[in-house]
Amino acid sequence: MDRTTRRDLLKTGAAFAGAANLAAPSARAAATASENCGSHWERPPKQEGNNLNVILIVADTFRADNLAAYGSQWVETPNLNRLADESIIFDDLHPEGMPTIPTRRVLSTGRRIVPTHAFFQHETGPGASPGWHHLYNEDVTLAETLVEAGYVTALIADLPHLQRPGRNFHRGYTYWEWIRGQETDYYAQPPRVTPDFSRLYPAEYLMEAQQSNPGFLSFLNRYTANRKRWLQYGDSIVEQTAKDAVRWLRENHDQGPFLLHIESFDPHEPWDPPDYFLEKYLKDPGPHSWPEPPYQRLNVPPEGIRRLRANYAGEASNVDYWIGQVLSTAEELGLKENTIFVFTSDHGALLGEQGQFVKGDDRIRKQVTHVPLLIRLPNRQYAGKRVAGFVQHFDLVPTLLGRLNLKPSPRVTGEDLWPYVTGERSNRRDHVVSAFGYVGAVRTPEWNYSAVWNREKYKGHYQPQLYDRKKDPDELVDVAGQNPSVTEKLQANLDRYISSGWDITKGTFNEIEL
């Protein structure tokens, strides 16, 4: 990893300050650039805040429109709907870096990560997912800041990618617990002889999927082995996660101020909800379970589309139920009036729109990027308040710390959103950037435009996409060819955002100097 001098970083800060109004990532960005601390971690200062507790819940792949507050008329989420009624609702949260691990880096630090530089996919070595790696040496996490302010900090997570060997997302937590078995976690030994998957998919689809993705059967082999093992302990993994969170709350709620950070991988695929939630959305589920949606464009028959959508909705309802168990426990313990509750997600998923499912660098559209952000304050302060305008995940750390009367690290590039809540200031961000790998999307109130931001490293051909959000709010019809002046303007915005962060988003990994 290239090192940058403090003088270089100061120059970068000046350049970034000039671009901040265009990309609008943060009011703190220029100062933050000059505080990029070389190759070492700097301990957060000792601080005294107001000692409010924080319960932060992140559910992976949770679309905003799963909730009534964001327009749901199908998915049943009564517990989160109740939380929304008591919360500040941020209307337009879109991630800066995607998917899973890039977003967790932003959530942990409050710092922008795009453009990305490193490429560690899994524990076996380099992969093809830019930004998918552990925290930098220099990063200062929310948990580290709170520990120095006297907090007890707990991370309870079933997200398998956080648990990979060498990952360090537990930094700053005085307690962490990994719940095993999600997706391709190395949790159960798959059989040497590939099982019969005819109960999962029709034979024609299974053949097409295997031809499109030679590793598909291997994936199914590990997933089904994992599922067989974790079903011994409950109907879903989020059940185990929530039960552990409830246990931790009962044992530690009176230990002083605390941060309880809960990470649920559900409703991330594979989509295999308990039958009692699936039946809410599909009375006749058919002979095939369709647990894993296709990442490629495959010929999914109508019955497969119906089952996949019902599977996803059932997963979301199951997550809601178990989050409800955590929330009701907090209420039982008398925590609702001295605790800040936060619910959000990293990204959403396509459910057959434009013939596509899940997410990818070719589908940075509303269904993937629009996610919920609910913040419930003690005494239901500002309950039901809707905050318009674009916000991003890096705003959460400074916003939370502000409500705790604590100062964020100088490395934070996000913005405290409180003035937008109180009306002291209006949100002036005219656009935000969301990136998936080497592709970035510029979202404005009128348009959503996506294109390759690193043409040197992107492999393959990518045709820029443009969606007219006024005429096409679901972003289904690409109109890039009809609007060259719009694409040119938005491409310039994307280029400025990338150039403004080129040095700010660098860091170092585990360097040892003797």
Each PLM stretch: what is its role?
Residues 196-197, 365-367, 434-481, 486, ...:
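C-terminal, low-complexity/hydrophilic appendages and adjacent surface loops
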Residues 75, 270-285, 329-382:
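Histidine-centered active-site microenvironments of extracellular/periplasmic hydrolases
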Residues 106, 111-231:
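Catalytic-site neighborhoods of secreted/periplasmic enzymes
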Residues 49-56, 166-177, 208-210, 214-226, ...:
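Active-site regions of oxyanion-processing enzymes, predominantly non-cytosolic
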Residues 107-108, 298-303, 324-328, 332, ...:
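Substrate-binding rim/cap in mid-to-C-terminal beta-strand-loop elements of soluble/periplasmic
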Residues 34-97, 147, 477-485:
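Active-site-proximal N-terminal segment of extracellular/periplasmic enzymes that hydrolyze or transfer
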Residues 55, 79, 257, 263-266, ...:
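Metal-dependent active-site segment of extracytoplasmic phospho-/sulfohydrolases and closely related
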Residues 3, 11-14, 29-52, 89, ...:
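Long, internal low-complexity/basic segments
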